[in-house]
Amino acid sequence: MKWWKTIFLSSFIILFCLLLTVSLFSFTLSEITTKENLKVFAGAVLKEELRSAKDLDLEKGYTLLLEQCQFQDTIEIPLEIQTVAIPCSDIKSSTQTTFVNLVINTFVDAIYDKNFDCSFISCLQKLNGTNLAFMLLSNTGHQFYTEVFLAFIALLLIVGILIIFMSEPKIAGIKNIGISIIIVGLGYFAFLYAKALLLSNVEVLSITPALFEILLNNFLILFIAGIVITMIGYYVLHYYEKRIKEE
């Protein structure tokens, strides 16, 4: 292989790894910020906060809330990070057991569907604190992460084609792509170690292990896919070289 082709091929492989890493993280963020997953993750945090709410004991005060609903249409639940307004009609149709889930679902729906009146990038510049955190977890954030993922997948396809084009023989490009995927997939072991280190030395939110699991699963899938593609690439390359020798 000519020296300039080697340089270009190495550059494209490095670029492929970088693009794949960004794609993986954007896909993970998109996965975490679906409304269904957010309700699960936010539920764990909010249940802890609801139990420690100073102004209201939800489990013991459910009867009191029903009494208050005789004189007003909406009840406001004061949480540390956000006040949640719940229609009394929903409270009356719930039970003491399901009321906590009602608060969680109402909270997530309000935050997730909130109109921030700015694009994701401009919101990053304008917002701060709690509002910025809410925006990152909202549908605005979810749509942005999904768009980034799709854009980088398109770039990956282009760079993948360039890797095949620069490889000699071109059929070896499959092997090169597979090895690149394995390199990124090795992040699984790095984050596995980081998870063990973090959870054993730092006090974290109860949802942190679940968030790590999503990221680890995606890295593991990538690692396994890389191994499979590399094996296919070596087999195809071996078959190609064998045919060339026979001819």
Model-derived regions: residue spans:
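Short, membrane-exposed interhelical loops at transmembrane-helix boundaries
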Residues: V202-I214
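Alpha-helical transmembrane segments of multi-pass membrane transporters/translocases
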Residues: L220-H238
